[in-house]
């Protein structure tokens, strides 16, 4: 799979959740996380995809750069955090695809999710469980998928 363009919506270490409003062609502050909670990585949307929740597929981007909403980053897929989400009585898949910025010097050595420590991956799962509670969405069956499985899943979402 060639490089994947991810558009940053919410920069890392921010407590504000930003979303792109297609009708207005602007980024809007959607939600503020509780005191002490922040996004551990840049979060964004993958171009030319449509996930089960009706939005472009979600991505987490590892980069040492400071970013802001609207920045386009060429990335390499390293896997995904699969999640089932219950919202309004309906269960859907709402995976977060994990990416490394292609030009990253700090994270360039990371090729797969297993390159992270077990503690890192457990904390990432906990972040999403807590984030789901803030959003009033129940996330279940959180598990990591390898690069190949993530590629197959992402291809299915391509528009």
Model-derived regions: residue spans:
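Hydrophobic N-terminal alpha-helices or hydrophobic patches in metabolic proteins across all domains
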Residues: 1-159
């Amino acid at each position: 799979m060639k490089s994947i363009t991810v558009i940053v919506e919410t920069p890392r270490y921010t407590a504000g959740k930003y979303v792109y409003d297609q009708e207005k062609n602007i980024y809007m502050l959607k939600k503020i996380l509780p005191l002490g909670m922040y996004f551990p990585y840049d979060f964004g949307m993958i171009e030319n995809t449509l996930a089960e929740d009706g939005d472009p597929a979600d991505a987490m981007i590892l980069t040492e750069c400071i970013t802001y909403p609207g920045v386009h980053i060429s990335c390499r897929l390293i896997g995904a955090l699969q999640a089932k989400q219950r919202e309004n009585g309906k269960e859907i898949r709402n995976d977060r695809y994990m990416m490394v910025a292609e030009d990253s010097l700090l994270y360039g050595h990371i090729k797969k999710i297993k390159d992270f420590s077990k503690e890192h991956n457990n904390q990432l799962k906990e972040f999403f469980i807590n984030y789901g509670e803030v959003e009033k969405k129940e996330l279940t069956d959180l598990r990591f998928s390898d690069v190949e499985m993530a590629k197959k899943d992402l291809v299915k979402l391509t528009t």
